[in-house]
């Protein structure tokens, strides 16, 4: 069974923990009092691998958004297979902040764009306007999904599972190539 390590990063109060809990089925509730993540939380769950009938164990690393944890980032990034950048579409400063997250967690790691996901998260009660976001050219290359767990939780789950299956598929192909190179 494959094991995929996916980081969930982004500015403080963007909804990273809510999304991590949601995708890993760690909790049923969506709302609640804000409690900032200290350092990192690791959630483990199985993700079915679509057409191959097998599954993959996913480690979802829910990373605290406070810059005081920056010294931990190299250790957190080590051996990661994917990065999800979460930001609040309701907080204008987040658009600028996610550029820093992209630089540190995607560009510096030289992660392929198909292993990255950008999520514009809407907090419960904030409406569902999907305004056009003014993203930098580097961020505009990433897949962007809008997340509103109140109105369309299954659409969000479907998009996240599609993203995770893509990572699992990449890992599988990589392993197959490695095995073939050993054989030949």
From Swiss-Prot:
- Pfam families referenced in this protein's UniProt entry, alphabetically: Roc (PF08477)
GO CC list: intraciliary transport particle B
Keywords for this protein? GTP-binding, Nucleotide-binding
User: CDD domains from the entry?
Assistant: Ras_like_GTPase
Q: Which GO terms describe its molecular function?
A: GTP binding
Kindly indicate where the leader peptide sits in this chain. none
Q: Which positions does UniProt annotate for GTP binding?
A: 10-17, 62-66, 122-125
InterPro entries cross-referenced by the UniProt entry:
P-loop_NTPase (IPR027417)
- Protein family (similarity comment): Belongs to the small GTPase superfamily. Rab family.
* Name used for this protein in its record: Intraflagellar transport protein 22 homolog
> Whose protein is this, by species?
Xenopus tropicalis (Western clawed frog)
